[in-house]
A protein has these predicted regions:
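Non-transmembrane "mature" sequence context
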Residues: 1-142
Length: 142
């Protein structure tokens, strides 16, 4: 199962988050305080092809807000963590970064034809993606 440490790694580690994160409560506090923009950049570097990063970033946080602020709002930080969590879970299931990325960007029939990366932008969508990925843990087709 994916641990918070794997999520923290995709957020850029303690340096990317801007504070030490030794527990899930520390990660929650960092999200509520607002993650630095670099945390989103780290997630996108892993999860998105270079040509798609700016578009996905602008779906997480409006372009003007991203350029104006050094820290994300708690709401945008939560979305960033959600993307990192889903990406970390895909990485854990496939044990291969390229295959994990391919899963995130390919429309999936169990997500009503949506791409997992798009579904993960909302809390309920992320839960759906996690359910699909959980099937892979049990050897079912993903």
């Amino acid at each position: 199962m994916v641990e918070y440490r794997q999520v923290v790694e995709l957020l850029g580690g303690s340096a990317g988050i801007g504070r030490g994160v030794k527990t899930l409560a520390d990660l929650d506090a960092a999200i509520n305080a607002g993650l630095p923009r670099s945390a989103l950049d780290h997630v996108l570097e892993f999860a998105a092809p270079a040509a798609e990063r700016a578009k996905l970033r602008n779906r997480v946080v409006p372009r003007a807000s991203y350029q104006r602020r050094r820290r994300l709002s708690p709401m945008h930080s939560a979305t960033t963590e959600r993307l990192a969590r889903v990406a970390a879970m895909a990485r854990w299931i496939w044990e291969d970064d390229e295959r994990a990325r391919a899963f995130l960007w390919r429309p999936h029939p169990e997500l009503r034809g949506r791409r997992p990366i798009d579904a993960a932008l909302t809390e309920l969508g992320a839960r759906e993606v996690e359910e699909v990925l959980q099937r892979g843990v049990h050897g079912l087709p993903v």
